[in-house]
From Swiss-Prot:
Listed GO CC annotations: extracellular region; host cell plasma membrane; membrane
Annotated TM spans: 68-92
Biological process terms in GO annotation: symbiont-mediated cytolysis of host cell
Record key words, sorted: Cleavage on pair of basic residues, Host cell membrane, Host membrane, Membrane, Secreted, Signal, Toxin, Transmembrane, Transmembrane helix
Role of this protein: Secreted protein cleaved by KEX2 in 8 similar peptides (ECE1-I to ECE1-VIII). Stimulates biofilm formation.
Name the record gives this protein: Extent of cell elongation protein 1
GO MF terms held by the record: toxin activity
Source organism of the structure: Candida tropicalis (strain ATCC MYA-3404 / T1)
Induction: Expression is not markedly induced by human epithelial cells.
Major localization listed first in the record, in broad terms: secreted
Amino acid sequence: MKFSKVASFAFLALSSQAALIQHDVIIENIKRDAVLAGSAENNIASSAFTKRESEVDSSEDVQLEKRISFAGIVSSIINQLPSIIQIIGNIIKAGLVKRDDIDDAFALVLAEYPHIVSVFEDAFGDFTEAKRDEAASVGTQILGSFPSILTQVVNGFSKVLDFANSDTFSTGLSILSNFTSIASSFASSLSSVVQNGKRDGVEDIVSMVVRQIPDLIVEASTPFVTNAEKMKRDADVAASLVDNLVKKGLSTAIDTFGAATVASVVSKRQVSSFLSKVLSKA
């Protein structure tokens, strides 16, 4: 498998690894794999999660997020950003990733979305929706609806790709380069939907919002995708792409879903196992 597959998942994998290694309560049972980054002459390697040295009984397989600090996980991920940027930067400078590899990575990520969503659905399957008359029900219901939210987000961007009069890679790059503006427009529309729902006395606002996510994404993204110039396919764009993914991806996810939810995703055993399999097969 091409090196681009490793690069596609490098950020989330490294972040997950750093968070788990730093905050797992049974820290002595984890081998701390090293992630090395060097010049063109050095070997550049990334490692996935290793198996625990001692088997953990299935009855003790409690949710990891209950044994860790959400704030600590987010902090550890942020602390790893300089190293992650250095690793990816060295890979690009060393010529190990070419423009075609970036394109392949885009196609791969799009193709893997259904699988990723199914993994997240399994990871969050144990969450249940709270009663609507409870004070904190909306927040809990949003967390319980996260698999549906993820699916609708994927559907929304799929519609954008179908609608755009451009190739998949250029469309993806246009979305990334304008992601801040798109996210702002989406958030504004989402706020309007919520306010209108409250005004109209809608009982289940969360479900109503989830149903409208694809259309809201299309509405927010289409102006940027259809009017943007076709982005150049060169090394500068590749570097800019990685920079946008690292800097905007994490901050947008935390701003949109909250630090606790993002921490929950990267801390779930199923997600970690999936990433480990992807990297080990590369």
